[in-house]
Each structure stands twice: as structure tokens, then as C-alpha cells.
């Protein structure tokens, strides 16, 4: 039976008694009214007091504060989510800045590593390769019937932690929690999915409590055929769904995105979402410095799908500001474990080959021509922006940062690797090495830095600024695909919200407390771009704004009326 969740009218439901209390989307706990307790056979199953959601949230907040360790707080919040989703989101709504690092990065990384140890209750769908003949049946088994947003992972590249098998399910669960908390997408319309294709992690395979398929990962044709079976089943079940690929390994992420982005409304947050939030941050930083992105030179440490995705977005923005493709690409330097990507390097991936530097342009460099290091790139190319997506801690050394500062008065340094333990440099070190001159944005949350009696806010270049607004914009506009223009619109809308760019002071990115308004602004621009590019039916801006407000779910209890199946 499909329930109508969007309006504020009374909700007619057929469930009663203990079954109703076990339904997280519908359970109100102690907030069921006397009339509802009588109508739904709840008398005796609840304490006498009828409470408001505010009173419930206050109790939950007090309980939350009793936990000393972040992983304990994560488990506690997940328990509330699996018991009473409306209360869970009301609690987040009042404490989002404190709780976002708990429900998502960095704590979700630890939760993924220990998924089988802390497992309490199933959420979402676990689609395993041994049961591949029954994918359609599995989708029919989903408790949510009108799914509008799916986040799917195969668990192979979880944050910077690598292959976690089905433990990777923690990422889709956390991501969809933020679609709701930040982007107002009703939890009734979201579905986390993990594709269990085995694992190559010996710790998981040898763990007697591991709950996934104990088998080495399937690869090549077997893997791609299985993913395709899943995609086709999703299209049959929910043809208008938004599908987000999450934490797939580099070798699979780009091919899957390229294959399906025009077949089903889909995007890869690690590639496109990371690129969009990074670009928005860089546009804002350039404005704050009184320049344009076309005037910057960018060095990357990490040339995987995420780094190359960011680079391509930067190049697109530079071109929109007047540079040719060749001029823009000459300003972007990609460094991986083998050194600077040049046209002499063999065995490059397709998406890397577009970002190589021409060897003849490096002829006058003072460097080791066989493997040009990041330090040598900084000395010779003199970048004004340094971006880390390597997943390796400490690689932005003091020597590299000080060398960058020699030729750049206001360097922009973005160590984006997650979780915190994998960050290329800590913000306090970057601030100190540049005597307070650097603009810093990180991938994980960091506290403000105090240096020489001045406080430096550290922007978290968090994809949560982008993907909830994209999702809301897609739902409100009815977009059938996500175009590059829609992603660019999201980046520019985020830059427009920068306190530093707008006021000359404050953080590079808006406060997380304002993220719902940021998401609405991004949704509007994404929806407009979808209409301009033919991905959605054209409406007026007013109609689009009304659709955004209509789709924006609030964690409030509705009254219930009893009905039969």
C-alpha cells in the first residue's frame, strides 16, 4: 500500500498496535494522542503521558550528550532513525552542526569498518550477486513503495578506507539522511542500496561476524552485467528515480557514470558532487581575492576520478570566463604517485589522458624529468591553488606549503581527503606555515584555528552543500537527467552564498546551520538549468520555487486516521 507523505493533511493508515510502533516512518512513540491511542490499539503499549515532538527531542538530546565516543553517538542516532524517523530528523534539525560529523564523515567511516559489529536492524536493500536472479523481487520487497532517490554503493572504495564490503552500506544510509536533513527530501522517498559483489578485504573475509557474501569480488563482465541487471530492474520499478552512485572504485566509477548518466537520471557524487562543491569554493575564494578562476594556476595531488572530475569542472569554469580549452588545461597540473601526468607517461586512464601536460612545455623546468614531484611542480608552475585528493595523510609538507607561499601572497589550500586521518595537511599547520595568509578548505570538519590572536574559520568542502540541493532541484523540476550545466549552476549558486566572497570576512562557505536555505537556492538554479538544457519541462521561476517548497519535507507529526488495506 502506498501512503501519501507530502501534504499536512491527516494520514490514513491501516497499521495498528505493535506493528505501527515498529514502523519508523509512522511511529510517534509517546506523541500519539489519546484519540490515536484508542483508534490504533495503542493503550497499554505506551506510557501515560502524551508528549510533543519538542519534548521527545529534548530527551533524546540529553541522552545523546551522555555518550563519550563518537561511534557510540552514531549508533544511538541510528537507533532513533530505525525507531522513529520523524523524531530523528527533528533532533538533527536542532543540532545539525554538531551531529553531521556523527551521522556522516568522519564517524561514518568507523561505522562502515565495524558495520557487522554494530549492526542492529536492517535498513535499505542488500542485493547480492548469488541472488542476482531475484533483483526484481528484491525491489518489490522494499518497504518504501514510491522511491524517488536511491544511493547505491558496492562498498569497494569507502571514503579513504578502501574495500569494506557490505559495511559500505553505512555510506548510502548516511548520505540519504543528509538528503532529508539538508535538502528536505522526505525519508519516505529514499532508499539506500548496497550491491554485495564480495570483498577483497581479508579482515572482512576472516571476520566470523561479517554479514556479507564471503567471496572475492567479481570483476570484469560478471561485475558490469550484474550492475546492469540492477539498473534495468530499477528502471522497471521506479523509472523516474534519481540514482546516485557512491564510493565505487576508480576503475568502475567513471565507466558506470558515462554508461548510465543519459539512460537513467543519475550522477556520481564522488566525481561530480565533489567537483561541484570544490568549484563553488574556488569561485568564492577567487572572488574574495578580487580575481577570477581563469587567473589561477592549480596543482592537484591525486589524479583519480575525484581529482580529475574537479579538474574538468575547473577547466569548464575557466573556459566560461574566456580562456580557450588549451589555455585552461595548461593551468592545471595533476600529480599522482608516479609524479606529474605528462604526455610521456604510459598506461594512463582515459579520463587522465585529457589532463596531461605537454612535455615540450616543461623543457625549461628544473626537475627530475622521469618523475616530477609535487614539490617540483610547486617550484616551477607556481600554483596559486593546491588541492589534495590523494587519500594519503601528511603529503602537503611544510616545505611544499612554504614554497607555494613564496610566490603566492594568498594561497588557496584544499586538503580534501576523508576521513580526518587521511588529510594531506592539518589546517593549523597550513595557517602557521603561511603566517596566516592561506585560505583553507578541508574535506573533513576542523575547528577554527587561532593564530597570532586571530581566528581563522576552516570551511569544510563538504558535498552536503551540493547533493541535497541537486536532489531537491531534480525532484522539483522533474528533470530526466543531470547535465554538466546543472552541476555548474549548483557550483555558482554555492559560491553566491559565500560569506567571505560577499562580505570580505567570515568563512569561505556558509554555516551548516544555513544549509537548508542554501539547498533551496541551489535547487532553484539547478531546476532552471535543467529547463534551459531541455532536461525538464519549462515552467516559470515562481512555479519552480513553489515546487521546491512543496517538496521540502519538515519533521513534524501529522494526525492519523484509521483505514483498512
UniProtKB/Swiss-Prot annotation:
PROSITE patterns: MALIC_ENZYMES. CDD domains: NAD_bind_1_malic_enz. Signal peptide: none annotated. GO terms for cellular component: cytosol. GO terms for biological process: malate metabolic process. Its cofactor is Mg(2+); Mn(2+). GO terms for molecular function: malate dehydrogenase (decarboxylating) (NAD+) activity; metal ion binding; NAD binding; oxaloacetate decarboxylase activity. Its EC number is 1.1.1.38. Gene3D superfamilies: Malic enzyme, N-terminal domain (3.40.50.10380), NAD(P)-binding Rossmann-like Domain (3.40.50.720). Keywords: Metal-binding, NAD, Oxidoreductase. It holds the Pfam family Malic_M. The active site is at residues 104, 175. The record marks 270 as: Important for activity. A divalent metal cation binds at residues 246-247, 270. It catalyses: (S)-malate + NAD(+) = pyruvate + CO2 + NADH; oxaloacetate + H(+) = pyruvate + CO2. NAD(+) binds at residues 157, 270, 418. It is an enzyme of class 1 (oxidoreductase). Homotetramer. Belongs to the malic enzymes family. HAMAP family: NAD_malic_enz. This is NAD-dependent malic enzyme. The gene is maeA.
